[in-house]
């Protein structure tokens, strides 16, 4: 459950390390985002000489949340951290590698590129 001002780890090799959510997309009154949702983020920490730099405003898709997500079979899944993958204007991942596991819900939301790059899909 991600809202405005939430900080997220970045789960790709785009060069950003931490980002802060500045808007949840999907309606004017939408407050929370969960796995598979797109948010607008600002880069708070970044490595030097990389694709993104501190202060960049980008879109990102949430791949892990600490708040559990209920699945249709009744099971729940939750992770140890809140993490996102940065997206470019076309909705494709900026990085070429994904670190850590991602949730299976991304497959249903057509983020197949992220699912194929991820080392583990839970």
From Swiss-Prot:
Encoding gene per record: rplN
Database matches in NCBIfam families: rplN_bact (TIGR01067)
GO biological process terms on file: translation
Any single Pfam family the record assigns to this protein: Ribosomal_L14
GO MF assignments: large ribosomal subunit rRNA binding; structural constituent of ribosome
Protein name, per record: Large ribosomal subunit protein uL14
Matches recorded under HAMAP family: Ribosomal_uL14
Subunit structure: Part of the 50S ribosomal subunit. Forms a cluster with proteins L3 and L19. In the 70S ribosome, L14 and L19 interact and together make contacts with the 16S rRNA in bridges B5 and B8.
Entry's family note: Belongs to the universal ribosomal protein uL14 family.
Keyword Oxidoreductase in annotation: no
Transmembrane segments: none
Function: Binds to 23S rRNA. Forms part of two intersubunit bridges in the 70S ribosome.
An annotated GO cellular component: cytosolic large ribosomal subunit
Organism: Nitratidesulfovibrio vulgaris (strain DSM 19637 / Miyazaki F) (Desulfovibrio vulgaris)
Keywords: Ribonucleoprotein, Ribosomal protein, RNA-binding, rRNA-binding
SUPFAM superfamilies in the cross-refs: Ribosomal protein L14
């Amino acid at each position: 459950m991600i809202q405005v001002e939430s900080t997220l780890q970045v789960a790709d090799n785009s060069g950003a390390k931490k980002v802060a959510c500045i808007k949840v997309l999907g309606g004017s009154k939408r407050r929370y985002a969960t796995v598979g949702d797109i948010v607008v983020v600002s880069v708070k920490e970044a490595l030097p000489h990389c694709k993104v730099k501190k202060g960049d405003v980008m879109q990102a898709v949430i791949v892990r949340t600490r708040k559990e997500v209920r699945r249709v079979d009744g099971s729940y899944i939750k992770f140890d951290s809140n993490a996102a993958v940065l997206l470019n204007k076309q909705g494709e991942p900026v990085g070429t590698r994904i670190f850590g596991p991602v949730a299976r819900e991304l497959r249903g939301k057509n983020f197949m590129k992220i699912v194929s790059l991820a080392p583990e899909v839970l």
